[in-house]
Structures are given as structure tokens and as C-alpha cells.
Curated annotation (Swiss-Prot):
Family affiliation: Belongs to the TRAFAC class TrmE-Era-EngA-EngB-Septin-like GTPase superfamily. EngA (Der) GTPase family.
Lineage top rank: taxon: Bacteria
Binding of GTP 1, residues: 10-17, 57-61, 120-123
PANTHER family: GTPASE DER
Entry binding sites for GTP 2: 184-191, 231-235, 296-299
Molecular function as annotated in GO: ATP hydrolysis activity; GTP binding; ribosome binding
Species per Swiss-Prot/TrEMBL record: Parasynechococcus marenigrum (strain WH8102)
Phylogenetic lineage: Bacteria, Bacillati, Cyanobacteriota, Cyanophyceae, Synechococcales
Protein name: GTPase Der
SMART domains noted in UniProt: AAA
């Protein structure tokens, strides 16, 4: 059984994301003094005592206004409560009861999910009890005074949360999920793709750029394998982004790339590859992440039997950083080839984690040398490649021992990398090669020997 879910519910700017960060001991949820910063529901891992659970942060609920994203935010909150064991309802103790709080209470009373009422911004325990007493009238049970920013009362609140969770013996050991980050420019269809993959409205979809302002974690299981999908805020040029929620969301997006096992880079089929797409491709390669390139909105392209081949050639010429990444033409709108994303991503992750024995590596290098010898300088010096070994995975990394790294130019280094890929595979993952000279190797050996003598 998956870990139980705790939903955080409340109107805008009452401190929901601050409480999430407090409960999860992190700063993943964006906190900013602008209402409506959180729009989609986002998940984090929570711990208390010997229990583990998922905390889902929802957007601020507003019932007297249907403009912009507010109806979708209400839908996201309703979906969060459907999967939750308990909903923690946050109100502002300093403001007292508002009409919005009463509307939320009415909304919650029609739901089967149990609720806990947390009165936030009660900085002192004595004043907190007096401030919280007013909220009995909401009909949501005992009000618990807390200060999310200082941690006052949050331990007692968590004790109450645990009473609503299913018994621990109903929870099984969970396999660590594969982290898959869905990244791309604004409005290329990342959230639509996430919803198509999950088969539900997990992320708010809108033609307005910047709808997603935070990273959104979604846990699903495909073919008995757990995945954690992260829909990220659209990444734009820094000079196009004002300081505020979108700025923080983009920083979260780069962090999502860093903590992912595989990135799905979404390209708009109508726009083709832009300069920003190229920068993202470079970031993925630089961070050493496995990758699948997904060309979305394929249904909107006028095409014949040669269009896909021609477009792939054009796209790959511009995404040369990711010439090793598989490319898939999809439509989030129609669902075309969406299921194939998992197969390609799973293969890329497998290759990203793969290790090869030293003997196999050197068989490939021997074959490469037989086809093309290292270059010779005008002075008659020729590069010599003695042997190689894999030193790391995630991404696969190899150290090649040579007489002098300076004798191996970029052209020959690319040739060796191609031969390693052709001989060993590694589709969907970058490969790192480290060229180490004989002098450096001997110096390291001498250092080790000296350390052994001293010990």
C-alpha cells in the first residue's frame, strides 16, 4: 500500500505552503506574500515519529470568483481530498473568521474526508488559545492554534494527524520511484502531457503562459514500477522573468532537473527548436541526466509520409547536445504515442545506471583502435591509448589512460565516444570520458604508496 496522504486546504495566503515546508522540513513549496502562488496540488514527503506520509499542498480556495484559474484550483483541492486520509484546514488566527472561511467550511462539510482545523499565525500559546476559540463556530471540530513559521503547536497537530492515518501494518515497503522531470519552455504542453500520462487533471492547463508556477510531483505506477513525475514551471530567459513566484518556480525547475533520473524535454512541433530549448538541452547534458525528447502538438502539423523524418533531422541538428537522446513525436491532446514515453524513459534510466566490466570496455577500445589509430603530431608524437575502465554510473563515466591527453583532439575523442556507444549501447544517456595521462597516473600511484607507508 502506498503511503497515506494528508491534504492541506485553505483560502489564499493563510500560510498553507509555509505549513507544508514545516511539516516536511523543507523549502520545496514556494512561499511568497502574493495570494495564489500555489495553483496545482504538489506533493512532498512528510515524517512524524515512526510514520511516513505524503503531504499535498493545494491552491488557495476562493468561491465568490470564477476568474482566471480559480475553478480549476477548486477542482484540484477536491481531487486532493478524494485521495487523502485527512485534510488539515488552515485559517488565519490574526484575521479571524472571514466569509471565505465559512464558504470553505461549507465545501468541506459535503466531503467524506475527515478534517483537522489549524489556526495559523498564533505566535504565542496563551494568545493562540483565545484566538482559536472563535473558530469553533465553523463546525469543523476543535481548532488547533499553531504558528507555521515558528513551529509552535505543529507537533501537537501532527500527533492528531497520525490518529487519522491507516494502521502502519497496512503499508508495504515501497520501491524507490524513478524521478522523471517534464521540462520545457512555457506553453509547450508540459501540463497537458502530464494529464495525458496520468489520465486525470493533475495540473491546471491554460493557454496563458506561466500557468504552472511550481514543480508538481505526481506518483504513479506503470507495469509494477513506481514513477514520480515532476511537471516544472516553464523555463524562460532570466531577463523575461520578474522577481516573484515565477522566479522561484524556475529555480525549482532547475533543481528538479538536478534531482531527476530522466528528463523529458518537451518541444513544440509548431515552433521547432528555439534558443531556449538549446539552453535546456545543454543544461541536461551538463548535469548528466538521461533524457527523452518529446515533440508535442504533432496533431497540429500538416504532414505527409516524409514529414517526421525531415523534422527529426532538423531538430537533431539544433539539439546537438542531445544527439544520444531518443525522440518521440506525440500529441497530449489526442494521446498519440503518449504511452511510449514510459518505455523510452525506462530504457534511458536503465542505461544511465548501467555498469560494464573493464574487459568488455577494453574489447571495444581495441576494436576502435584497429579501425582508426590515434593521431600523430607534426613532430612525430603519436597518442597511445593503453586501457580504459568505467569509474561511475549515473551517468556512465569512463577513465581512459593514455600517454598524453593533449595528443587526442576533439575529433578523435568524439570518435572514441561514438565507438563506445556503438559497442556498448547507452542510448538515452550522456557518456562522460576522462582522459588521464601517464604522468598523472604515476603521480597518483606514488601518492598512494607514500600514504600506505605512513600508515
Amino acid at each position: 500500500m502506498a503511503r497515506p496522504v494528508v491534504a492541506i486546504i485553505g483560502r489564499p495566503n493563510v500560510g498553507k505552503s509555509t505549513l507544508v515546508n514545516r511539516l516536511c522540513r523543507s523549502r520545496e513549496a514556494i512561499v511568497h506574500d502574493e495570494p495564489g502562488v500555489t495553483r496545482d496540488r504538489t506533493y512532498q514527503d512528510g515524517y512524524w515519529g515512526d510514520r511516513e506520509f505524503k503531504v499535498v499542498d493545494t491552491g488557495g480556495l476562493v468561491f465568490d470568483d470564477d476568474s482566471e484559474f480559480l475553478p480549476e484550483i477548486r477542482e484540484q483541492a477536491a481531487l486532493a481530498m478524494e485521495e487523502a486520509s485527512v485534510a488539515v484546514v488552515i485559517v488565519d488566527g490574526q484575521q479571524g473568521i472571514t466569509a471565505a472561511d465559512e464558504s470553505i467550511a461549507e465545501f468541506l462539510r459535503s466531503r467524506p474526508c475527515p478534517t483537522l482545523l489549524a489556526v495559523n499565525k498564533c505566535e504565542s500559546p496563551e494568545q493562540g488559545l483565545a484566538m482559536a476559540a472563535e473558530f469553533w463556530s465553523l463546525g469543523l471540530g476543535e481548532p488547533h492554534p499553531i504558528s507555521a513559521i515558528h513551529g509552535v503547536g505543529t507537533g501537537d497537530l501532527l500527533d492528531q494527524v497520525l490518529t487519522f492515518l491507516p494502521p502502519k501494518d497496512q503499508e508495504g515497503d515501497e520501491e524507490e520511484p524513478i524521478q522523471m522531470a517534464i521540462i520545457g519552455r512555457p506553453n509547450v504542453g508540459k501540463s497537458s502531457l502530464l494529464n495525458a500520462i496520468c489520465g486525470e487533471q493533475r495540473a491546471i492547463v491554460s493557454p496563458i503562459r506561466g500557468t504552472t508556477r511550481d514543480t508538481i510531483d505526481t506518483n504513479i505506477v506503470r507495469e509494477n514500477r513506481p514513477w514520480r513525475l515532476v511537471d516544472t514551471a516553464g523555463i524562460r530567459r532570466r531577463r523575461s522573468v520578474n522577481y516573484g513566484p515565477e522566479y522561484f518556480g524556475i529555480n525549482r525547475s532547475f533543481k528538479a532537473i538536478d534531482r531527476s533520473d530522466v528528463c523529458v524535454l518537451v518541444i513544440d512541433a509548431l515552433d521547432g527548436v528555439t534558443e531556449q530549448d538549446q539552453r535546456l538541452a545543454g543544461r541536461i547534458e551538463e548535469d548528466g541526466r538521461a533524457c527523452v525528447v518529446v515533440v508535442n502538438k504533432w496533431d497540429a502539423v500538416e504532414k505527409d509520409s516524409h514529414t517526421m523524418t525531415a523534422m527529426e533531422k532538423e531538430l537533431r541538428a539544433k539539439l546537438y547536445f542531445l544527439d544520444w537522446a531518443p525522440m518521440l513525436f506525440t500529441s497530449a491532446l489526442t494521446g498519440q504515442r503518449v504511452d511510449s514515453i514510459f518505455a523510452l524513459a525506462a530504457l534511458a534510466v536503465e542505461q544511465h545506471r548501467r555498469r560494464v566490466s573493464t574487459s568488455v570496455v577494453n574489447e571495444v577500445l581495441k576494436e576502435a583502435l584497429s579501425w582508426r589509430s590515434p593521431p600523430t603530431t607534426r613532430g612525430g608524437r603519436q597518442g597511445r591509448l593503453y586501457y580504459g575502465t568505467q569509474v561511475a554510473s549515473r551517468p556512465p563515466s569512463f577513465t581512459l589512460f593514455v600517454n598524453d591527453p593533449k595528443l587526442f583532439g576533439d575529433t578523435y575523442r568524439r570518435y572514441v565516444e561514438r565507438q563506445i556507444r556503438e559497442g556498448l549501447g547507452f542510448d538515452g544517456t550522456p557518456v562522460k570520458l576522462y582522459w588521464r595521462g601517464k604522468q598523472q597516473r604515476d603521480a597518483e600511484r606514488d601518492m598512494v604508496r607514500q600514504q600506505n607507508r605512513q600508515s
